[in-house]
């Protein structure tokens, strides 16, 4: 029922121009402008609440271009070793110079310089440089679903699964991660996330204030990677936490559409 309601509202948004939707969204949800980009603010808000970016010696930024998550983490840990992986054939994804020119930041792109986490050679390079070594892994990747918002969960499934596998390869025991996720209505999505969180002592689903209220973006924050994973069934708890954010999203989508109708 929640999925149908959300899909209907997302379909209703397609009746309005992208420019109108952006203006209405900014009017409703954006606070006064700040000098920091939205991605920086999101990780700042996550870190203020959960303290995952402090005292980091080594971290990996997965699918992180243009690099605000990495920038924020390095600002707190100026002497850390930082690694980043991002697509190089998409101008929206490449790391900006202020990130990739830092002496303590190493970009991992693979032999073909693609930075594609689905490429086995890129995965191999990541595992060699970061395997079992990171205090923190940040995974903020997503697939562009413009015009296909109702397929966002399906279109992002493979990427999120790939990121979870890389997180488990790269985190040391006791390490933490921040993983962007979207909807989790499908059985395979919930099962994938259930299997993943069993590798951690604690986990929580969270939407930082700077994440736009009407979209499906949330973050799965996991603490203290275990040497041996649990065998717990977290499906009900995962569904409960997702449902909380579905209801908030419904409320904000209705606000957005009502404003657009004026």
Feature-to-residue mapping (PLM):
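Beta-strand cores of modular interaction/reader domains in eukaryotic scaffold and signaling proteins
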Residues: 58-63, 83-84, 138, 178-180, ...
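Short "lid" loop at the C-terminus of a central beta-strand within the Rossmann-like core
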Residues: 88-90, 144, 183-186
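Class I S-adenosyl-L-methionine
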Residues: 189-240
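Beta-strand-rich binding-surface signature
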Residues: 40, 56-59, 79, 131-135, ...
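Conserved proline-anchored active-site loop of SAM-dependent methyltransferases
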Residues: 60-63, 128-148
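Intrinsically disordered, low-complexity glycine/charged-rich regulatory or linker segments
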Residues: 1-130, 235-262
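A short acidic (Asp/Glu
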Residues: 68-74, 93-96, 148-150, 187-193, ...
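Conserved Class I SAM-dependent methyltransferase catalytic core
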Residues: 150-205
């Amino acid at each position: 029922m929640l999925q149908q309601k959300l899909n209907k509202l997302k379909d209703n948004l397609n009746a309005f121009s992208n420019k109108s939707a952006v203006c209405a969204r900014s009017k409703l949800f954006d606070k006064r402008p700040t000098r920091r980009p939205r991605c920086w603010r999101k990780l700042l808000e996550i870190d203020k609440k959960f303290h995952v970016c402090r005292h980091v010696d080594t971290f990996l930024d997965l699918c992180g271009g243009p690099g605000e998550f990495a920038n924020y983490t390095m600002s707190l840990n100026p002497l850390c070793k930082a690694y980043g992986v991002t697509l190089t054939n998409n101008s929206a994804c490449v790391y900006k110079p202020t990130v990739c020119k830092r002496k303590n930041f190493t970009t991992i792109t693979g032999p073909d310089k693609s930075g594609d986490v689905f490429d086995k050679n890129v995965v191999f390079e990541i595992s060699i440089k970061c395997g079992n070594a990171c205090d923190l892994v940040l995974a903020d990747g997503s697939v562009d679903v413009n015009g296909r918002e109702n397929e966002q969960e399906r279109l992002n499934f493979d990427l999120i699964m790939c990121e979870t596998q890389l997180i488990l390869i790269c985190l040391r025991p006791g390490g933490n991660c921040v993983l962007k996720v979207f909807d989790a209505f499908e059985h395979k999505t919930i099962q994938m996330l259930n299997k993943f969180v069993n590798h951690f002592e604690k986990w929580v689903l969270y939407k930082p204030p700077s994440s736009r209220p009407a979209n499906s973006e949330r973050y799965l924050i996991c603490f203290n990677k275990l040497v041996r994973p649990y065998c717990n069934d977290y499906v009900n708890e995962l569904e409960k936490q997702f449902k909380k954010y579905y209801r908030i999203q419904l409320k904000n989508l209705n606000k957005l559409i009502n404003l657009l109708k004026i």
